[in-house]
Amino acid sequence: MLMATIVASALMFGWAESAVSMPCRAEAFLPSGRIAVGANYWASHAATEMWRKWDAKAVEEDLHVLSENGINLLRVFPNWADFQPIHACFLSGDNFDKVYETRMFDSEEPLPDTPCGRAGVDERMVVRFEEFCDIAEKRGIRLIVPLLTGQMTFRNFIPPALANRNPFSDPYALMWEGRYLECMVSRLKAKKAIVAWESGNEARILGRSENAFQSEAWLRYVHQTIRLADPSRPVIGVDGLSVSREGVWPSAMNAALSDYVTTHPYGFWGSVYNDDFNSVRSLTFAAAQTLALEQIAGKPAFVEEHGSRRQEQTSQRGVADYMRAMLWNLWAVDAKAMLWWCAYDQTGMTIAPYNWRPPCVELGLFRRDRTAYPAVATMRKFAAMQEKLSFAALPRAKPDAVVLAVDDDVIHSSYILARQAGIFPAFASPEEKLPDADCYFLPDAQGRAYLTIERWEELKSKVCGGATLYLSWNDTFLDSLEEVTGVEVSFREKRGGLDICDFGDFKVEMPYAIKRKFNALTAETLARNQDGDGVFFRNRYGKGTVYLSIHNFEKTFYERVGRYESDGFKIWATVRPVSRIVETGDKNVFVSEHVFGGGRICVVVNNSPVPYDRRPTVAEGWRVTDTATDAPELAKFKDGRILLGPNCGILLIVERK
């Protein structure tokens, strides 16, 4: 009865409600409240040359191993150069730059008068892809097909006729892209294993888009061509989080043209790599990006690629532990899937690009001989746990505050600080109409913080009406700041240093690059530095409250090592105090609450390499009635205590007594 209540209540509390607004084809592909686990696939024997070196027996064995280990969702890539091997035949003399005819193959054969031939598509490759689909269907494996692949592991596999042409703008290239897409989708749409189409692999870097107008024109053309040929399946957008309209591939545009949006949150680029691989920073990166993308873009999001450079980052066991916590974190934010890069290692291959300097060739879940790494068991156990649950889907967690941010690093930093403070955040673009909320965070408010006049007036109106606003200063020059924040700048000098900020019951070290001092006008000073200068203020604005931090520590913490082990999160907790039904007392053991009827599902995740063994605080009048975990040997709730091994998670069902 309890589990039936959870299922029914999910319809009332968010996850199913949002599903109604998305296309039916999308919800059927990756429903909310579950995490599909999968991989990106190239054949173990030949990688990017699998189609020209087709070996059905090897492929069948690959897919057998994957399906036996619970990996039933694959992203599989038709190598564009192999599937459309067209050559441009040029004139000479004054017309040297004019294409007179397009032929196929290095032997320059005339285009056959067939549907494939007129599209410049090699019939043999399509037949092989159809055979692949049949093998996948037999194994119960679903397929995502990025059609214009294209970009792959630092190399562009472009048809010879299109070499050195911009695929986003060149008319000749666009014509052949359209023919290719129409041919491939029309031919392959009968294959039941295919569940979604995609423009290509990381298609935004197939070439160089000049601006967002060109990006939209190209993506609209590609997606409409796919949908005309097959309106029954979802079409996935290009990857990545790009909040501002000023970007070349803005997420709002991408989402408007797509049924799904995706992240490729590798943890070895940029500042996410500052802390250890199994630290809270790394473990939450995929969840933060995917949550922000879905909320800002307004379309369901999932992790389409993710992986690790093992030798550089951690041990094999470390990857398995990392994956466990990462999956729990993704589930808590209602990411829909996680596909690892990639299924099989690409060791021992001298073909380009695997013999080049940049690629890491040991990224697989399995070695080339198909033996599994420890992370495979992690994926299998997580998938099995979901199948054993008595409820269909995890209801979405209700957000406690809205974060307005554009910068990727600030978004992730804000997510960490919020979750450490017990706040479940929602994200929104400061350029778009603001969602209603009781509390808004405006971290790293550089300049006008991307707020237009309309958005700033809207935000002030919400605060005046009773909402809370937090702003961290970064040479901010929004109008009426003295009135809103109750402070004014009295000193600014470009020299670095360290403030030790005293909040009374805790202290936080704040590194800075610019020294600033502020005068309190109508604001109350809540914290001071070692010189007695105010660093954190509170001001009444209408019926609402405004908090100001003179340090944009959300940004500066992210640029440095180990900052998330400090008490910085307590600043956010001061702004938005939250009481949970279950509280762990450890900033890195996150709890999210998911409402069902009169009860709660609490997802508890240890985002630390250190075991957690403590009696949590359970709110008076509530009791834990059931649990679930993917690692029962490491995660337990017994006699009122939670025991979580490193990077482990547990689900608690909590009901009123």
Question: For each of these PLM feature ranges, what is it?
Answer:
Residues 220-222, 230, 398-421:
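Short, charged N-terminal beta->alpha structural module
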Residues 343-397:
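Aromatic-rich peripheral "rim/lid" segments of glycoside hydrolase catalytic domains that contact
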Residues 24, 29-253, 258, 349:
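Active-site mouth of glycoside hydrolases
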Residues 242-244, 417-435:
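A short, well-structured beta->alpha microelement
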Residues 448-657:
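A conserved amphipathic helix/loop scaffold
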Residues 306, 319-355:
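Substrate-binding cleft of secreted/luminal carbohydrate-active enzymes
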Residues 434-448:
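Short, well-ordered secondary-structure micro-motifs within conserved domains or adaptor modules
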